[in-house]
Amino acid sequence: MKLLCGFFLLWLGLVGNLAQSDPSPKEEESYSDWGLRQLRGSFESVNSYVDSFMELLGGKNGVCQYRCRYGKAPMPRPGYKAQEPNGCSSYFLGIKVPGSMDLGIPAMTKCCNQLDVCYDTCGANKYRCDAKFRWCLHSICSDLKRTLGFVSNVEAACDSLADTVFNTVWTLGCRPFMNSQRAACICAEEEKEEL
């Protein structure tokens, strides 16, 4: 009962203060403007979180492709200089993967570098980049087979490793791809908003 009375008194106090304050129309406009701006900002923040979550899951509807907000094609960012490819190390869920995870196979590092360059090219298609990456990895196994002759255990292990690395990139590579595309591209409407 005391709690109910407390809420009632609080409500009366708030209603009384609102009735006493008679803001001028100018103040009211700025208050409603502020409210609309805050509301818009909140929706944009929620949308940004949803987009980030979708990137972690592999993109919207399972499609990982960078698009501008109003359906226009992204354009290369003027003056953008891509980062140096960093081999097979990267960030996973925002945490730097240690260099020790890089297997240090020069041919594999070459494949990873090609993937980095592809991701950093504005307008690239993630699935084409990934397909080239898979082909590069499996070409290592083919070269190994030619060098060592027919050794089924080595060939099977190599193919298995190549498929594992490829599937990891295919499944978890949407976020790095989208981050690279955001850095390499600009959308016409973004340029207007920044002015």
Swiss-Prot record:
Keyword Signal in record: yes
Any one GO biological process: triglyceride homeostasis
Claim: Calcium is one of the keywords in the record: yes
Annotated GO CC locations: extracellular region
InterPro entries in the record: PLA2G12, PLipase_A2_dom_sf
Organism superkingdom: Eukaryota
Cofactor binding description: Binds 1 Ca(2+) ion per subunit.
Family membership: Belongs to the phospholipase A2 family.
Keywords: Calcium, Metal-binding, Secreted, Signal
Protein name (Swiss-Prot/TrEMBL): Group XIIB secretory phospholipase A2-like protein
Signal peptide per UniProt: 1-19
Subcellular location: Secreted
Cofactor needs: Ca(2+)
Molecular function via GO: calcium ion binding; phospholipase A2 activity
Positions annotated to bind Ca(2+): S89, Y91, L93, D116
Main location: secreted
Matching Pfam families: PLA2G12 (PF06951)
Function per UniProt: Not known; does not seem to have catalytic activity.
